[in-house]
Curated annotation (Swiss-Prot):
One of its GO terms (cellular component) is site of DNA damage. GO terms for molecular function: DNA-binding transcription factor binding; histone H3K14ac reader activity; histone H3K4me1 reader activity; methylated histone binding; protein domain specific binding; transcription corepressor activity; zinc ion binding. Residues 1-850 are annotated as: Required for interaction with CCNT1. Chromatin reader that recognizes dual histone modifications such as histone H3.1 dimethylated at 'Lys-36' and histone H4 acetylated at 'Lys-16' (H3.1K36me2-H4K16ac) and histone H3 methylated at 'Lys-4' and histone H4 acetylated at 'Lys-14' (H3K4me1-H3K14ac). May act as a transcriptional corepressor for KDM5D by recognizing the dual histone signature H3K4me1-H3K14ac. May also act as a transcriptional corepressor for KDM5C and EZH2. Residues 433-442, 472-489, 818-832, 873-884, 1121-1140 have a biased composition (Polar residues). There is a cross-link at K56, K70, K390, K413, K453, K505, K530, K549, K611, K645, K657, K1115 (Glycyl lysine isopeptide (Lys-Gly) (interchain with G-Cter in SUMO2)). Zn(2+) 1 binds at C91, C94, H111, C114. The gene is ZMYND8. This is MYND-type zinc finger-containing chromatin reader ZMYND8.
């Protein structure tokens, strides 16, 4: 432990305090308050002056009372420069010593390898933890949850998290480490931390975000690894504590209100809707039926679902989620009580939402889940145009807890003041995520960047604020404003129908994708401006506001082309951007809107041609109808155009407001909404400004309006409407009817003069469909769709004139389609060329419309055939192009069979005569320039490919270098891990060896003790028994004091050896003396008996009694085996013992014999012998059993 190189002289603390006085903010317990690192004073939440006022108190709080007592072990200033006494000694990542980088804001240090840095950074350096906390606490980049919470509320939630971290077994981390028990703790641990300290800091409101709290909590694990080692039991517990902390912080970030409710666990806490309610879904887990749940968030194609009932949670694949409908997506045969209780709880939740927000909508059956679905469930079904129910943002949510919507989101104040449109500043409100894409850009690239920032940082806020934006910005006054700023500041872009789509886009596409949408939008809007402005210039009519937009267009053309191409290259798109944001979106609202807007262009154009009749009212009606395309879209398919016209007239201002919701009601896909919004901004204000002006420049199929035709049916099939319709007919052949309906709907609002009886217009639309195969040719096919709509007279006009759909208009239509389908690929020269052709066609159109000669029906049919031939010619002449959709977008001629005079048909036929020639010329021009455009596009693509390959090479080299650094770091970590494991294993082996030895010694001692005990017992048992002196078996017979035998053979075998020491031989003389005494007495008695024969028996009896007495004595003494026979063997002695007894018996009878003397002498001898050596076996060999 090279602590000597880490520590410094005692004055270092004061020096560093002076050094860090100003750059260092007041410390939270982890040594920093990272929000102060931001340069803007607005972002600071604590003043740096606090450091000076209570520096000692703060330090004691951070380091404990013993921090300043920590003295350096040596005064060797080896590592004074990198280590200045205010930083830790151990790397924050690997928890080891070494050459480290010190953070300027906190005590943490890092190895350069652990940070994957090739070289040490210059100047002040801030560690990743501090950067993370700074980002999390900065007002502009803080998370959605942090924008909703104040510091007090966050501190309140952190207290719950700390309580959950106090799990059983974490007692060691709940209080500071007692230095009395661990006096060396301060030598290793620079920054002590425990749960009690965390709780105190939370009470003091020292944490501005969850990241700061988590970073502080990680000190517990860091210190534990340093002091106890990475494999210690306490370290495992510390890891569990940190995992719990990470989980709790993550839950707070997901939804603070849900977290609080889950912690407080009130009655029906799961049924309380949040201020921004979570969508309800049917979610399915494997092995379970579809279950009602809240969708809190979605990530990587998975939905974080919280289920009703048991309140379980799970990540469910997004394709297994359906929006909440009244019926379960896939019915279950038998429902269990658990499911029923979950459904009841969900119904309570729905009621609470209705009580809080006033509305809740069940989605249609099996509607797939998409993000931001809460807006669909909050749509008012009775008044869909009103948008979503207003979500409370101003009120603080009172959940026994002050949870506010962030004060930064001041959405409720009106965005527009008065009737004039002004640019909405970022300071007033964070932009809706769609705002960057939807507004018509006036060239402020800086502002667009700022808006992009706003979309990312205020994602959630803008979601919540969509309804405000909708209601405040969609006012008719703002749309009608004639100032230049109204184009950019027109509030239409902020309609809520766009908020949902763009939020998904921002989540799921890269920034290049958003740039692409931005540029497509801008280019489209400028194309509209070009067409309108040129048409106005051609008619030489006063245009108040077109010229500024014209300048904007010319200023941005080159930049836009470059940007579009670069975006296309970045996204790897070989085909048209239509697929990016239009064709992919199977949308009818786009087409409807396009047709509506183009209707108004045709209307104002035709009305301008009828200058003799100042029908300004109709022109205004056209503009009004123009303002409300979505309202038109929403209405049911019309069968009476006049009614629609009146309806449009009467409801135009109101439906202006309603039209954002209109698109939503149709539940059109999000990209469709996106595009419909894009379609709105530029056409509306310009058309308002161009009221009464000519709009023949509009590159759509214009319809010849006679000056006296008031109620005639305007059949609009042009521009993008027809082009998109072609694409849509290809992708969604089932959906032509909405477009046709719109075509039938919109014209009536542009009636001009005469009264005509009701007639049935037959709309024949030949819409071209563009198909881009790879990067190659566009093939177009003509499809005719006939829509018949009964059109009663608007004002009872006797004759309704037919306006033929002029085929010569196909070229302008093509031009518009070309722009929208390949806007990324065109250069300025191509654009200007197309506009030039457009002007020529418009001039021809005006001439033909003024002529309007009569023609025959057959000629009209021939004209259509010619037009079709021209289309085929265009297709064949256009070489494989991936960028230009050479489609005569809509060749439609409405055949209106009139119940009135035939003059209408004749005039329309005559009007068609010069048209075929014009169309052929246009086709020739298009074919002529196709190759040139393709060459330019090929060159551009080659350059893009080269640039991309270069960039790829550079990035590959950088990637290789990064991977090498990564490999080195991993190798170093591997070596460190191996060395640590080796060291730990050696320690473990030593401990195991020592323990085994101790165990062996212990066992040996125990065994010895046991064996000694058993030996003693065996000895004792052995001593209790007599053993044979010859064979060592257990003895039965006793010879003398130390000699016993198991049997007679052993006695005989052992006798030669034992004879010398036998104790019985020592007692033999005494026995002989006793025998002599007995013999003498016997002799005396025998002599006395001889005198009297009567006394003999009695004497004999007395003698025998004496013998018995002596025998008993010898029996009692039992201590000797009389072996006094001089040299006789024991066997003879033993044999003689039995004979002796027989002799004694015979001697008893011998006294009765006559030969008394001889018998007495023999008996005396025998008696002495028997007493001497021939005792009975019982007397001679005593048996001793235990």
């Amino acid at each position: 432990m090279d602590i000597s190189t880490r520590s410094k002289d005692p004055g270092s603390a004061e020096r560093t305090a002076q050094k860090r006085k100003f750059p260092s903010p007041p410390h939270s317990s982890n040594g920093h308050s990272p929000q102060d690192t931001s340069t803007s004073p607005i972002k600071k939440k604590k003043k740096p002056g606090l450091l000076n006022s209570n520096n000692k108190e703060q330090s004691e709080l951070r380091h404990g009372p013993f921090y300043y007592m920590k003295q350096p072990l040596t005064t060797d200033p080896v590592d004074v420069v990198p280590q200045d006494g205010r930083n830790d000694f151990y790397c924050w990542v690997c928890h080891r010593e070494g050459q480290v980088l010190c953070c300027e804001l906190c005590p943490r240090v890092y190895h350069a390898k652990c940070l994957r840095l090739t070289s040490e950074p210059e100047g002040d350096w801030f560690c990743p933890e501090c950067e993370k906390i700074t980002v999390a606490e900065c007002i502009e980049t803080q998370s959605k949850a942090m924008t909703m919470l104040t510091i007090e509320q966050l501190s309140y939630l952190l207290k719950f998290a700390i309580q959950k971290m106090k799990q059983p077994g974490t007692d060691a981390f709940q209080k500071p480490v007692p230095l009395e028990q661990h006096p060396d703790y301060a030598e290793y641990i620079f920054h002590p931390m425990d749960l009690c300290t965390l709780e105190k800091n939370a009470k003091k409101k020292m944490y501005g975000c969850t990241e700061a709290f988590l970073a502080d909590a990680k000190w517990i694990l860091h210190n534990c690894i340093i002091y106890n080692g990475g494999n210690h039991k306490l370290t495992q517990i510390a890891k569990v504590v940190i995992k719990i902390c990470e989980h709790e912080m993550n839950e707070i970030e997901v939804c603070p209100e849900c977290y609080l409710a889950a912690c407080q666990k009130r009655d029906n806490w799961f049924c309380e809707p949040c201020s921004n309610p979570h969508p309800l879904v049917w979610a399915k887990l494997k092995g379970f039926p579809f279950w009602p749940a809240k969708a809190l968030r979605d990530k990587d194609g998975q939905v974080d679902a919280r289920f009703f009932g048991q309140h379980d949670r799970a990540w469910v694949p997004i394709n297994n989620c359906y929006l909440m409908s009244k019926e379960i997506p896939f019915s279950v045969k038998k429902t269990k009580s658990i499911f029923n209780s979950a459904m009841q709880e969900m119904e309570v939740y729905v009621e609470n939402i209705r009580r809080k927000f006033g509305v809740f909508n069940y989605s249609p059956f099996r509607t797939p889940y998409t993000p931001n679905s809460q807006y669909q469930m909050l749509l008012d079904p009775t008044n869909p145009s009103a948008g979503t129910a207003k979500i409370d943002k101003q009120e603080k949510v009172k959940l026994n807890f002050d949870m506010t919507a962030s004060p930064k989101i001041l959405m409720s104040k009106p965005v527009l003041s008065g009737g004039t449109g002004r640019r909405i500043s970022l300071s007033d409100m964070p932009r809706s995520p769609m705002s960057t894409n939807s507004s018509v850009h006036t060239g402020s690239d800086v502002e667009q960047d700022a808006e992009k920032k706003a979309t990312s940082s205020h994602f959630s806020a803008s979601e919540e604020s969509m309804d405000f934006l909708d209601k405040s910005t969609a006012s008719p006054a703002s749309t009608k404003t004639g100032q230049a700023g109204s184009l950019s500041g027109s509030p239409k872009p902020f309609s809520p129908q766009l908020s949902a789509p763009i939020t998904t886009k921002t989540d799921k596409t890269s920034t290049t994708g958003s740039i692409l949408n931005l540029n497509l939008d801008r280019s489209k809007a400028e194309m509209d401006l070009k067409e309108l402005s040129e048409s106005v210039q051609q008619q030489s009519t006063p245009v108040p506001l077109i010229s500024p937009k014209r300048q904007i267009r010319s200023r941005f053309q080159l930049n836009l082309d470059k940007t579009i191409e670069s975006c296309k290259a970045q996204l790897g798109i070989n085909e048209i951007s239509e697929d990016v944001y239009t064709a992919v979106e199977h949308s009818d609202s786009e087409d409807s809107e396009k047709s509506d807007s183009s209707d108004s262009e045709y209307i104002s154009d035709d009305e301008q041609k009828s200058k003799n009749e100042p029908e300004d009212t109709e022109d205004k009606e056209g503009c009004q109808m123009d303002k409300e395309p979505s309202a038109v879209k929403k209405k049911p398919k019309p069968t009476n155009p006049v009614e629609i016209k009146e309806e449009l007239k009467s409801t135009s201002p109101a439906s202006e407001k309603a039209d954002p919701g209109a698109v939503k009601d149709k539940a059109s896909p999000e990209p469709e909404k996106d595009f419909s919004e894009k379609a709105k901004p530029s056409p509306h204000p310009i058309k308002d400004k161009l009221k009464g002006k000519d709009e023949t420049d509009s590159p759509t199929v214009h319809l010849g309006l006679d000056s006296d035709s008031e109620s005639e049916l305007v059949i609009d099939l042009g521009e993008d409407h027809s082009g998109r319709e072609g694409r849509k007919n290809k992708k969604e052949p089932k959906e032509p009817s909405p477009k046709q309906d719109v075509v039938g709907k919109t014209p009536p609002s542009t009636t001009v003069g005469s009264h005509s009886p009701p007639e049935t217009p037959v709309l024949t639309r030949s819409s071209a469909q563009t198909s881009a195969a790879g990067a190659t040719a566009t093939t177009s096919t003509s499809s005719t769709v006939t829509v018949t709509a009964p059109a009663p007279a608007a004002t009872g006009s006797p004759v309704k004139k037919q306006r033929p759909l002029l085929p010569k208009e196909t070229a302008p239509a093509v031009q518009r389609v070309v722009w929208n389908s390949s806007s990324k690929f065109q250069t300025s020269s191509q654009k200007w060329h197309m506009q030039k052709m457009q002007r020529q066609q418009q001039q021809q159109q005006q001439q033909n419309q003024q002529q309007q000669p009569q023609s025959s029906q057959g000629t009209r049919y021939q004209t259509r055939q010619a037009v079709k031939a021209v289309q085929q010619k265009e297709i064949t002449q256009s070489p494989s192009t991936s960028t230009i959709t050479l489609v005569t977008s809509t060749q439609s001629s409405p055949l209106v069979t009139s119940s009135g005079s035939m003059s209408t048909l004749v005039s329309s036929v005559n009007a068609d005569l010069p048209i075929a020639t014009a169309s052929a010329d246009v086709a020739a021009d298009i074919a002529k320039y196709t190759s040139k455009m393709m060459d330019a596009i090929k060159g551009t693509m080659t350059e893009i490919y080269n640039d991309l390959s270069k960039n790829t090479t550079g990035s590959t080299i950088a990637e290789i270098r990064r991977l090498r650094i990564e490999i080195e770091k991993l190798q170093w970590l591997h070596q460190q891990e191996l060395s640590e494991m080796k060291h730990n294993l050696e320690l473990t082996m030593a401990e195991m060896r020592q323990s085994l030895e101790q165990e062996r010694d212990r066992l040996i001692a125990e065994v010895k003790k046991q064996l000694e005990l058993e030996k003693q017992q065996a000895v004792d048992e052995t001593k209790k028994k007599q053993w044979c002196a010859n064979c060592k078996k257990e003895a039965i017979f006793y010879c003398c004091w130390n000699t016993s035998y198991c049997d007679y053979p052993c006695q005989q075998a052992h006798w030669p050896e034992h004879m010398k020491s036998c104790t019985q031989s020592a007692t033999a003389p005494q026995q002989e003396a006793d025998a002599e005494v007995n013999t003498e007495t016997l002799n005396k008695s025998s002599q006395g008996s001889s005198s009297s024969t009567q006394s003999a028996p009695s004497e004999t009896a007395s003698a025998s009694k004496e013998k018995e007495t002596s025998a008993e004595k010898s029996k009692e003494s039992g201590s000797t085996l009389d072996l006094s026979g001089s040299r006789e063997t024991p066997s003879s002695i033993l044999l003689g013992s039995n004979q002796g007894s027989d002799h004694s018996r015979s001697n008893k009878s011998s006294w009765s014999s006559s030969d008394e003397k001889r018998g007495s002498t023999r008996s005396d001898h025998n008696t002495s012998t028997s007493t001497k050596s021939l005792l009975p076996k019982e007397s001679r060999l005593d048996t001793f059993w235990d």
